[in-house]
């Protein structure tokens, strides 16, 4: 099985909250696509609660678009990581990490302004696969934590696992 890009970085040295360019590529028509690792939690030390990350998934996607789309950038998708330590964001364009960090912080401010669970987009049986598994309070706790700690930049060069270590770990 091929080694995915996300597993070539040392998760024991990853900071959080932090932005990292996980991958860049071009479409056959030459459009740049960038995938960002938006790391909310320190891997193997913290984890977002399932109800909170689910609610955040519903809110974060729209709020990030409000703050990041434009000037050559259009978000394709924002999805939670299975390990519940962050989100992957795929977009058209190549914004720098600081622009993404600023949009992320603004989106977290927006999450804190949501006053009622009824304001969560697509929170119904028709548009959500587990519409009863939500917590606005947990999502706001996550947002507050991000804003209190600020958002840093994780560098691929600093986090790269040495080739020898990758060979040792590869099954």
Curated annotation (Swiss-Prot):
Pfam families according to UniProt: LuxS
| Molecular function terms from GO | iron ion binding; S-ribosylhomocysteine lyase activity
Top-level taxon of the source organism: Bacteria
Q: Which reaction does it catalyse?
A: S-(5-deoxy-D-ribos-5-yl)-L-homocysteine = (S)-4,5-dihydroxypentane-2,3-dione + L-homocysteine
Query: Which keywords has UniProt assigned to this entry?
Result: Autoinducer synthesis, Iron, Lyase, Metal-binding, Quorum sensing
Q: Which cofactor does it need?
A: Fe cation
Regions annotated as coiled coil: none
Q: What biological process terms from GO does the record include?
A: quorum sensing
Q: Which residues bind Fe cation?
A: 54, 58, 128
Q: What class of enzyme is it?
A: lyase
Enzyme Commission code(s) on record: 4.4.1.21
Q: How is the cofactor bound?
A: Binds 1 Fe cation per subunit.
Recorded family membership: Belongs to the LuxS family.
The task this protein performs is described as: Involved in the synthesis of autoinducer 2 (AI-2) which is secreted by bacteria and is used to communicate both the cell density and the metabolic potential of the environment. The regulation of gene expression in response to changes in cell density is called quorum sensing. Catalyzes the transformation of S-ribosylhomocysteine (RHC) to homocysteine (HC) and 4,5-dihydroxy-2,3-pentadione (DPD).
Question: Subunit composition?
Answer: Homodimer.
PANTHER family per the UniProt record, alphabetical: S-RIBOSYLHOMOCYSTEINE LYASE (PTHR35799:SF1)
Name of the protein in its database record: S-ribosylhomocysteine lyase
Gene designation per UniProt = luxS
